[in-house]
Amino acid sequence: MTDVPAPAFDGKAFAAQLSTAPGVYRMYAADDTLLYVGKARALRNRVGSYFNGSPKNARIMSMISQIVRMDVTVTRSEAEALLLENQLIKSLSPRYNVSLRDDKTYPHVLLTREDWPRIALHRGPRAIPGRYFGPYPGVTAVRETLNLMHKLFKLRSCEDSVFRNRSRPCLQYQIGRCSAPCVELVAPAEYAESVRRAALFLEGKSDELTRELGEQMQAASEALEFEQAARLRDLISSLRSMQTRQYVDGRAADLDVLAVAMQGSQACVLLLAFRDGRNLGTRPFFPRTNGEESPEEVLAAFVSQYYIEFEPPREILLDREIPDADLLVAALSASAERKVQLKWNVRGERAGYVELASRNAQLTLATELNSRNAQHARSDALREMLGLAEPVKRVECFDISHTLGEATVASCVVFDAAGPVRAQYRRFNISGIEPGDDYAAMRQAIDRRFRRAVEEQGVLPDVLLIDGGAGQLAQAQAALADLGVEGVLLVGVAKGVERRAGHEALVMPDGRELRPGAANPALQFIQQVRDEAHRFAITGHRGRRQKARMTSKLEDIPGIGPRRRASLLKHFGGLVGLKAAGEAEIAKVEGINDALAARIYANLHGLATPDAAE
């Protein structure tokens, strides 16, 4: 029995039965791959335009030829359709859409929601309760902002585990950057007021804050509270001094400047951000394009996708007019619940900002293209050295990091011909092995990564680099063999006798060793991938180790709750001091009797507890 081919998609018939309401349409290929997401003022007219026989460019014709089905979602307005369209593009990355890809997470300033809030740099999901201010163009801008926060408002930055267990103020208090809420040297109401002022500042309301502080200073003077008035005076002076040093243009206020540069199918959108008149710096983005979009289309796609995720400022300057600008303004204003303006062809100081962004976009794109060309050359050299017939599309590398067997973490980094693919990096917390057994750790990590790929028919690398010699390579080979994974070339990266860069030996599955030499571009590519795997593993290990060392297991001991735990840690200055104490010393802590002291000592030293002995 032969398979009956699926009938060709009848686009005209599909469009004819659609309504003229606004909405979003989606196009799918035979393997159910999403080809394209689009919005429409009138669905019937827009969808029908693809199938009316009029001339279209090669990209559109190629897309239409692959369609096997379509579906639509009706919306209440075209602005709502625009928002939905870009949410789908952002989450699904259709093949033929311009898509904003950025592997990096956006840094924010986090002001936590707790009795004594802390202020900190934050990346990643917003899992911690609190207020998030940003995004900022880069980490440097966040750190500069945090530096100001500590100088002006003296908010704590320490982790809760440190905060709860301090018995005296830290260095930050001594240098005037924290008010020491850990030991309550500041009243709760006074600290809460500092938090409120910091939030005003981060919202870009420093002028309002300065006026408010002036009124409070006047009131304190009239009430003869001269010390309070002096503190407020100093704070106002610091605020004004900061404004004088950092404000570029008071009229800039909250403002983003966007410029686009294109060369062939490569595009760079550069964001220059101002908040409360301060220049926060630039950040480049490299959207995925199909090579036939205009710079105006790329910029319009960026605006809609970026500001769906992040709150737009009141004013956005563009280096050119973009399609559907009025619709974008309506959608962004509705989303932000306030007026948002898109402007181009501006004059004066703002024209200078646009020119600056445009020049930086062009320079950044040129630098990126040079980097990608060099990366492609290295990737081609790797293919030639390994004797592969096809281009190397995906390389993965595993590394193991621990401290004497403690907090073992494995990393897996991913590179393609253009460089690192950070969104696909993975870390594995290793458990259930003998501490310090790197072979077992490597085997567990390989098994976990590729077992999931087998079960979910995931993507496999062309080349799998293992940081280690023949022993580590054998573990990876065994793990892949157990899972039935084939078609992946394994290469061990062994340090030379002198353990110097450029002297590495590449261990092949058949036991051969290749020594390309430091000048070989293929080895340079391997070193780049290996070093990134090492960096990613060691940062994960340090984080896990720090968390383990800061988190006491005292509460797992019967009879120890949060209050007794706090008393013990405060009395001994931390877990290290407690572990060094004998049973008699532990029993001197308030609330700890001899039996409980014996149980604590036994648990901390891995001995049989008195209860277990009985």
Swiss-Prot record:
Domain UVR: 207-242
Summary of subunit composition and partner proteins: Interacts with UvrB in an incision complex.
Membership in a protein family: Belongs to the UvrC family.
Compartments in which it is found: Cytoplasm
Record CDD domains: GIY-YIG_UvrC_Cho
SMART domains, alphabetized: GIYc, HhH1
Gene Ontology BP term (one): nucleotide-excision repair
Gene Ontology cellular component terms for the protein in this record: cytoplasm; excinuclease repair complex
The protein's name in its UniProt record: UvrABC system protein C
Alphabetized UniProt keyword annotations: Cytoplasm, DNA damage, DNA excision, DNA repair, Excision nuclease, SOS response
PANTHER family named among the record's database cross-references: UVRABC SYSTEM PROTEIN C, UVRC/OXIDOREDUCTASE
Family matches, as HAMAP family: UvrC (MF_00203)
Gene symbol of the encoding locus: uvrC
NCBIfam families: uvrC
Xref: InterPro entries: GIY-YIG_endonuc, GIY-YIG_endonuc_sf, GIY-YIG_UvrC_Cho, Hlx-hairpin-Hlx_DNA-bd_motif, RuvA_2-like, UVR_dom, UVR_dom_sf, UvrABC_protein_C
Function: The UvrABC repair system catalyzes the recognition and processing of DNA lesions. UvrC both incises the 5' and 3' sides of the lesion. The N-terminal half is responsible for the 3' incision and the C-terminal half is responsible for the 5' incision.
Pfam families attached to this UniProt entry: GIY-YIG, HHH_5, UVR, UvrC_RNaseH, UvrC_RNaseH_dom
Domain GIY-YIG intervals: 20-98
GO molecular function, one term: DNA binding
Keyword Transmembrane helix in annotation: no
Keyword DNA repair on entry: yes
